[in-house]
């Protein structure tokens, strides 16, 4: 079986949901085998980091629980190094305004994330009423208007598929659907954040290893990096992968690291 060169230090980036974490958004848990794998990777001398679409605030719990000090968050637009948030690049404000204006015109519920927190804001209760969402807390801010904020990090549009394809304004923004009740308007360029971290540490990008499962991981499945798709990954990601492991809840992280020789020091 093909293996990575044993003595070479690798820079390994893990997606969270569906990769490190199983159970979906409602019953998330980290498989014990994944925790063991992370410890063995550290013992082997590798650099470990998270690469998630979650906001930095929404990912901090897993970062601390699993002992990470470095993280790409916010779909590639947020960077945390040595435990300190460096920055988060917001979405293009005018693009977000156009999306929200179209939602208003079509009477589609919406919400915004205007700071790095675990709470999003909505102009009324319709977003929460529509979604019954437990992923993050939604607070009602009467008169909420994206034009009043300097920075907007994410927007959320409550709709069932295929409504999103009727929204012309979505053609100019990155977005994805991870839940049936709503879509996320959020950055989708994890490779951008990974390169920033590699530049900071002066490391060769050829030493990058990435683990992912979903459409927002496609941006980090690039040529020249070692790409591992979970068994539960979407087909498009598997087609780009160098190695396909077992499902997240079937020891996928551990099995891949063992198969690729990453535990060897």
Language model regions located:
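Short, Lys/Arg-enriched N-terminal segments with co-localized hydrophobic residues
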Residues: 1-7
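Asp-based phosphoryl-transfer active-site loop
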Residues: 10-26, 221
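Hydrophobic "anchor" residues on beta-strands that sit immediately upstream
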Residues: 11, 70, 203, 209, ...
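Active-site phosphate-binding/coordination module
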Residues: 29-126
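Short, structured coil segments at secondary-structure junctions
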Residues: 66-67, 75, 168-171, 223-224, ...
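Short hydrophobic/aromatic-enriched beta-strand-loop microsegments
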Residues: 68-76, 89, 132, 175-177, ...
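Conserved acidic, metal-coordinating active-site core of Asp-based
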Residues: 102, 108, 113-223, 232
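Asp-based, Mg2+/Mn2+-dependent phosphohydrolase catalytic module
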Residues: 223, 227-228, 232-265
């Amino acid at each position: 079986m093909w293996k990575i060169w044993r003595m070479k230090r690798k820079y390994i980036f893990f997606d969270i949901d569906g990769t490190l974490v199983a159970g979906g958004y409602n019953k998330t848990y980290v498989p014990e085998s994944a925790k063991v794998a992370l410890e063995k990777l550290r013992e082997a001398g590798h650099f470990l980091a998270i690469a998630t679409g979650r906001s930095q605030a929404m990912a901090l719990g897993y970062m601390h629980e699993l002992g990470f000090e470095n993280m790409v968050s916010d779909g590639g637009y947020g960077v945390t190094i040595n435990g300190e948030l460096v920055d988060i690049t917001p979405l293009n404000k005018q693009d977000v305004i156009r999306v929200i204006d179209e939602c208003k015109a079509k009477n589609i519920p919406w919400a915004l994330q205007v700071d790095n927190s675990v709470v999003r804001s909505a102009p009324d209760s319709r977003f929460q009423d529509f979604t019954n969402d437990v992923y993050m807390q939604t607070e009602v801010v009467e008169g909420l208007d994206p034009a009043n904020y300097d920075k907007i990090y994410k927007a959320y549009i409550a709709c069932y598929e295929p409504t999103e394809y009727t929204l012309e304004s979505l053609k100019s923004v990155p977005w994805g659907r991870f839940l049936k009740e709503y879509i996320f308007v959020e950055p989708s360029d994890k490779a951008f954040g990974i390169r920033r971290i590699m530049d900071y540490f002066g490391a060769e990008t050829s030493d990058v290893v990435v683990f992912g499962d979903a459409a927002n991981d496609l941006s980090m499945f690039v040529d020249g990096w070692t790409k591992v798709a979970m068994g539960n990954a979407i087909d498009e990601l598997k087609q780009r992968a160098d190695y396909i492991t077992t499902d997240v809840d079937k020891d996928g992280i551990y099995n891949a690291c063992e198969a690729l020789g990453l535990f060897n020091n």
